[in-house]
Design a protein with these regions (language model features):
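A short helix->loop->beta-strand "cap" motif at the edges of active sites that frequently abuts
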Residues: 144-148
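Bacterial N-terminal signal peptides that target proteins for export
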Residues: 2-13
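Bacterial N-terminal signal peptides
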Residues: 11-22
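Residue-level recognition of beta-strand->loop/alpha-helix junctions
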Residues: 75-77, 153, 192-194
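Conserved SGNH/GDSL esterase-like catalytic core that processes O-acyl groups on lipids
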Residues: 33-39, 45-134
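Hydrophobic positions in alpha-helices of CheY-like receiver
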Residues: 136-140
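Bacterial Sec-dependent signal peptides at the C-terminal "C-region" and cleavage site
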Residues: 20-32
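Substrate-gating cap/lid alpha-helix
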Residues: 157-194
Length: 194
């Protein structure tokens, strides 16, 4: 075999090995598992209002620490947000809702309803609550058809809170019942935060 032919053959083999290695590495990178996205949708409780250093201690941050690197947890909490579309601060009109849709969560934890106990909201729009809740779920499902829903019961209203004193404890109970009904209707999981 001549020297030139040997070098040509060796070059072809090296080129083949290089191409094979490059393709294998590219395929391996494509097989890298993407993290499971968890969208935490809610109000000030989700946001972390009142928590010292909320960027490190809000429940979505704590959830991220518990779940680890295989998950990506997004905090889409909006202080004062109502679930009701006709409420005083509808979640669906907030930037956080648009961000939650763009996030395309694989899991959506929804913790809304506490601000709907406001006298401006529940007495006037209670009949829209189930429909509005299911509509939010439908929007999140449109962003990711395989989304898994986890609905959170509302946290208690403190007995010193003005809404408790004003008699909205009954409304709180009615909303709690509605959330349980929504979980049953939709097949979503139901959890407590307390």
């Amino acid at each position: 075999m001549s020297k030139n032919r040997f070098h040509t053959t060796l070059s072809a083999i090296l080129l083949g090995v290089f191409c094979f290695t490059s393709l294998t590495l590219t395929a391996a990178r494509k097989k890298t598992v993407k993290p499971i996205k968890v969208a935490c949708v809610g109000n000030s409780i989700t946001y972390g209002t009142g928590i010292k250093d909320r960027e490190h201690f809000s429940y979505p941050v704590q959830l991220q620490k518990m779940l680890g690197d295989k998950y990506e947890v997004g905090n889409f909490g909006k202080p004062g947000a109502t679930l009701l579309y006709h409420g005083h601060r509808p979640y669906v009109q907030q930037k956080e809702f648009k961000d939650a849709l763009a996030f395309k969560g694989d899991i959506a934890v929804i913790h809304l309803g506490i601000n709907d106990t406001d006298p401006r909201n529940w007495p006037n729009y209670r009949d829209e609550f189930v429909k509005d809740y299911l509509s939010i779920m439908d929007s999140l499902r449109a962003a990711n058809p395989k989304v898994r829903f986890i609905l959170a019961r509302m946290t208690p209203i403190a007995d010193r809170h003005p809404r408790f004193i004003s008699g909205t404890k009954l409304w709180h109970d009615e909303i709690q019942d509605a959330i349980e009904t929504i979980a049953r209707i939709s097949g979503a999981e139901l959890i407590d935060f307390h």
